[in-house]
Amino acid sequence: IPLPRRQLYGKLNHLFRIWVTGADNLLDDEDKCVLPLALPGSSRVMREVVSIMAADRILWHLLTRAVADGTITTREADALANESLRLLLPSAAQEASEESGVTQRPSPAYVLNVIHLLKTGLLFNIPFLGIDWIEKQIDSGRVARLKQALRQFGGGCQILDDIRDMARDFIEHRHNYLLSLLARDKPETLADRSHRKLSVSDRLYFHVPWSSL
């Protein structure tokens, strides 16, 4: 892959990081800085909004410059712009389905193989955007193996989030692999917790250490 296109793909990956992390910050009231901004006041929400808007404008400039330099064609730039949104939609749809809370806990296998795949696993295939649409000479079998490995790695990252966010997900009725394990194997533990006052910062996993093994 020529150096100019490799550099373009790397820059696109940073934009995806801004979009994904910025959205997570808004959804989970977190403060992971991905684009340093000097804004008046201390509003974290508006900082994330501006970061996401800025990343969108940066994408336009990157693609326009890449076309002007002959790095990619106009058609390829259009494909990258369109796919940059489409790749984020499965995760967005899964997050949207949990905003009002889930009424029942699905099986741990379903959480692991379906929900975590949509929410996080597929996001780890984003670095292949340019390869999928432009680099047709690349070994497709090798790409498929790398994608599968990265999807599994992404699922592992989501499990770590589930451990950390057990209390938040319990209170807000969101999908969580460990909570689904408890619902299946130790429903009395979940019932007991439902009668106690919890905060999202509680380290609930300390009380059920076996569930993370």
Residue ranges and their predicted role:
Residues 2-5, 44-45, 113:
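A short glycine/serine-rich beta->alpha loop
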Residues 10-17, 80-83, 174-181:
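Short, mixed-charge, low-aromatic patches
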Residues 49-162, 167-170:
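All-alpha helical catalytic cores of prenyl diphosphate-utilizing isoprenoid enzymes
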Residues 21-43, 128-138, 151-211:
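Acidic, Mg2+-coordinating active-site segments of isoprenoid diphosphate-utilizing enzymes
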Residues 71-77, 206-213:
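Transmembrane helix-loop-helix
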Residues 11, 18, 44-54:
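Helix-rich alpha-solenoid scaffolding regions
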Residues 1-38, 94-107:
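Conserved N-terminal diphosphate/IPP-binding helix and adjacent helical/loop segment
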